[in-house]
Swiss-Prot record:
Pathway: Amino-acid biosynthesis; L-histidine biosynthesis; L-histidine from 5-phospho-alpha-D-ribose 1-diphosphate: step 1/9
A Pfam family it matches: tRNA-synt_His
Additional record remark: This function is generally fulfilled by the C-terminal part of HisG, which is missing in some bacteria such as this one.
Protein name: ATP phosphoribosyltransferase regulatory subunit
CDD domains: HisRS-like_core
Compartments reported by the entry: Cytoplasm
Protein role: Required for the first step of histidine biosynthesis. May allow the feedback regulation of ATP phosphoribosyltransferase activity by histidine.
Family: Belongs to the class-II aminoacyl-tRNA synthetase family. HisZ subfamily.
Primary gene name: hisZ
Length: 395
């Protein structure tokens, strides 16, 4: 590599400089404090671990986004975490092994081999919260509410939410006896809203099931979609009707708590279909092609760790929230310039100032007073009348 190229970073990998790094860190602390106030406990997971553990229950999408390396000590394949959820699920199922509900949260960098979308970061700072041990819509509403509180804390404006339920499609596909290949083809067609493909793939099914699967393309819009779904899917299996009931219960609670929040329903939206088992949700803002926060229910993710506990949660990228948020993050302003001196009294004074939360920068040998300005100092320590005093910086 030529010297001129050594400063280049890989596509989608970025460094964060001051003061943006300080804004992100302050926001991280604020969000974790918010999570704690809701009863969520922080966990810290490994950056890298054996691949079979990292991808357990996570589906093919996560496999494709995971950087893989060979462990030089064991010779086993390892992966850098691309998502916290499988790791947190292992902690709940195998390590904590609590009988009752467990609320866990996290914040840290993840690494993606492939970007989520064009021009998106491959090294986001993922933060999120997960609730294990309760299968009711109440838990889904809780994590959605915490997600909205996170967006409110960072002052992300003009949000709207998409809601769906993968159990609706899964129940219809199971009733139709679709093979794995056809189920995947139909899934792909539904995501693209391809009416002709959906029609062709369901043409040979029993009339009622074919009509209900085709209806999923059109069952998208406002609150009225849920009432329409009750009619058009009225002959669906009990599991599908139960999924509709759950979605309605969640929508009712959200509408009560957030009457100004636009809710959009799409019963053909199957985000995370490979591992989600129930409600799925995502938040969008104008001007962003991808969701800025997302989540759902994934009751089976802990099965490979010995406990298939009910689970629901959400995640978001902290760097995106700080970029989009309008909240003013107040950074510590100014500082105190400390002269280069071996005076013990000066050192005691500096220690006291720092303990009080003051920012004190020491001059290095040969540095002129003008260097204090580059260090963002507006005051200085000067010895007067036999003691060190903090005075305005003189130019």
């Amino acid at each position: 590599m030529a010297t001129v190229d050594r400063w280049l970073l890989p596509d989608g990998i970025e460094e964060v400089l001051p003061p943006e790094a300080a804004r992100i860190e302050i926001a991280r602390r604020q969000v974790l404090d918010l999570f704690q106030s809701w009863g969520y406990e922080l966990v810290v997971t490994p950056h890298i671990e054996y691949l079979e553990s990292l991808l357990t229950g996570a589906g093919q999408d996560l496999d494709q986004r995971t950087f893989k390396v060979v462990d030089p000590q064991s010779g086993r394949l390892m992966g850098f975490r691309a998502d916290f959820t499988p790791q947190v699920a292992r902690i709940d199922a195998h390590t904590l092994r609590r009988e009752g509900p467990s609320r866990l949260c996290y914040a840290g960098s993840v690494l993606h081999a492939q970007p989520r979308a064009l021009s998106t970061s491959r090294s986001p700072i993922q933060l999120g919260a997960e609730l294990y041990g309760d299968a009711s819509p109440t838990s889904d509403v809780e994590v959605i509410s915490l997600m909205l509180a996170t967006l409110q804390l960072t002052d992300v404006a003009d949000v709207h939410m998409d809601l769906g339920h993968v159990g609706i499609y899964r129940g219809l596909a199971r009733a139709a006896g679709l093979s794995g290949a056809v189920e995947q083809q139909l899934f792909d067609a539904l995501q693209r809203k391809s009416v002709d493909e959906v029609q062709a793939l369901t043409a040979d099914l029993p009339k009622d099931l074919g009509n209900m699967l085709r209806a999923l393309v059109e069952l998208c819009g406002g609150r009225e979609v849920l009432a329409e779904a009750r009619v058009r899917l009225g002959r669906a299996p009990a599991s599908v009707l139960a999924a509709l009931d759950d979605l309605l219960a969640i929508a009712d609670r959200l509408a009560s708590r957030y009457p100004e929040l636009p809710l959009y329903f799409d019963l053909g939206e199957l985000r995370g279909y490979n591992y989600h088992t129930g409600v799925v949700f995502a938040v969008f803002v104008p001007g962003e092609g991808q969701s800025i926060a997302q989540g759902g229910r994934y009751d089976d993710i802990g099965a490979d760790f010995g406990r298939a506990r009910p689970a629901t949660g959400f995640s978001t990228d902290l760097k995106t929230l700080v970029t989009l948020g309008r909240a003013e993050v107040v950074l510590p302003a100014g500082g105190i310039w400390m002269p280069d001196s071996g005076d013990a009294a000066l050192w005691q004074q500096v220690c006291q100032l720092r303990n009080e939360g003051q920012r004190v920068v020491q001059a290095l040998p040969g540095q002129p007073l003008s260097a204090a300005l580059e260090a963002d100092c507006d005051r200085q320590l000067i010895q007067q009348d036999g003691r060190w005093q903090v005075l305005p910086l003189t130019h």
